[in-house]
Amino acid sequence: MSQLLTPRQAEELHKSIIAYFLSAKLPKSAAALREEIADSVQLDDSTAKKYEGLLEKKWTSVVRLQKKIMDLEARNSALQSELDSATPTSLSRRNQDPVSWLPRAPARHRLESHRNPVTSVAFHPVFSSLASGSEDTTIKIWDWELGELERTIKGHTRAVVDVDYGGPHGGTLLASCSSDLTIKLWDPSDEYKNIRTLPGHDHSVSAVRFIPSGAAGSPLSGNLLVSASRDKTLRIWDVTTGYCVRTLHGHVEWVRDVVPSPDGRFLFSAGDDRVARLWDVSSGETKSTFLGHEHFIECVALAPPTTYPYLAALAGLKKPPPPSSSAEYVATGSRDKTIRVWDSRGTLIKTLIGHDNWVRALVFHPGGKYLLSVSDDKTIRCWDLSQEFKCVRVVTDAHAFVTCIRWAPNIIKDAGGMGVNGDINGGGSLALSGVNGIIPGSKKEDPGGGAKLGIRCVIATGSVDLNVRVFAS
């Protein structure tokens, strides 16, 4: 002991141990230690109070430090692996190719204004506007290119849980849902005026998404909105009338998340019953169920057609599905800390393990090669589909749980002009709304008459640390 500790350190250790024995009502042990050290330690009541709890604090500090060291070693190992797999040529190509772009810390912008945790983010399909919802009951509109707050929208009386841009052609709207049981529609072209409130759910509304107009047979051509709720239902709304046109029953617990397919034909939902469901919008029937998670399912994502070659190979298929098909593959994230990837029949393809806490949100890279996930472990993880979902990057920039992630919509280049709300009317370029930025029935490089899709290398995340972060190339 004398070789490891100075006399003063040894004395403080003895005092801490004796104080611990006394606080734990072990006077005999304290007396025995005093006798062993020849009662050289003077410990009156005030001194004992000073040292009480010090031993426990030292112990827990060591445990926390050990965990931090292990986390840093794992991070160092991941970075070393990434460095080893990169050559100057591949790095140069990756930096220039949007298909291979992945976010890096630090974020380009850290947007601060919310007073409570950020629950959701959404990009405007045309302009550089980013909406964020928060438990502080507000929605904030930011210019993500400049990193500036444009306006604060008030109207909900409880936490705003989700936000989404979409709506009919030529009339982009912002939808929000809340723990106050309502969905609200806001008009970006009229200073985000609240144009409609949709009541009907019997409990908190946990997710809201516009259903894309999509392919032939898709009803009402972009006028539909889907919501998920703690009342165990999904509701489909006509945004032009405000009426609920269909209620979907099937889940037996809180429905946490829902996303539509790019062609508007299917919905994918999941929640606290640990079951994900694929729904046919036209019939309202469940097409497939997905079973396997051991805890609540927090989030879902539909894989865009650009992922099909990678996922078909993992599923053992010789030929991928045609790009015109939708909802061929899906992903779910859960409080069991795993991500699961499935085919449309409910067959499990891959289980992704790596997060140390609840998985809160998922988004596929528009280029098709990566899946990004965020978690209560404060990280963004990037999984490479071409390497059987190997985690190739861990981004640690947040200081608390990361609650949401969205990718900026793709841009259609040389596809005709755009009106104020995204309607095509001349020459120019148009940002692409919808799920994962995919045009239903179109090829990535030729979506209708020579237009090309330009991937925007921009993502946004929200966190319990009250910040919205924008990562961009």
From Swiss-Prot:
Task: Name its GO BP terms in alphabetical order.
Answer: cell division; establishment of mitotic spindle orientation; microtubule sliding
Disulfide bridges in this chain: none
Compositionally biased, Polar residues: which spans? 80-93
Q: Where is the LisH domain?
A: 9-41
User: What CDD domains does the database record attribute to this sequence?
Assistant: WD40 (cd00200)
Q: Where are the residues of the annotated region Disordered?
A: 80-99
Q: Name the keywords, alphabetized.
A: Cell cycle, Cell division, Coiled coil, Cytoplasm, Cytoskeleton, Microtubule, Mitosis, Repeat, Transport, WD repeat
Where is this chain's protein located in or outside the cell? Cytoplasm, Cytoskeleton; Cytoplasm, Cytoskeleton, Spindle pole
At which residues are the WD repeats? 113-154, 156-196, 200-247, 250-289, 292-352, 354-393, 397-434, 435-472
**Keyword match Cytoplasm:** yes
Q: InterPro entries, from UniProt?
A: Dynein_regulator_LIS1, G-protein_beta_WD-40_rep, LIS1_N, LisH, PAC1-like_LisH-like_dom, WD40/YVTN_repeat-like_dom_sf, WD40_repeat_CS, WD40_repeat_dom_sf
GO molecular function annotation: dynein complex binding
Name the job this protein performs: Positively regulates the activity of the minus-end directed microtubule motor protein dynein. May enhance dynein-mediated microtubule sliding by targeting dynein to the microtubule plus end. Required for nuclear migration during vegetative growth as well as development. Required for retrograde early endosome (EE) transport from the hyphal tip. Required for localization of dynein to the mitotic spindle poles. Recruits additional proteins to the dynein complex at SPBs.
UniProt record similarity statement: Belongs to the WD repeat LIS1/nudF family.
Concerning HAMAP family, the annotation shows: lis1
| Entry note about domains | Dimerization mediated by the LisH domain may be required to activate dynein.
Q: How does it assemble?
A: Self-associates. Interacts with NDL1 and dynein.
Protein name as it appears in the record: Nuclear distribution protein PAC1
Gene that this sequence comes from? PAC1
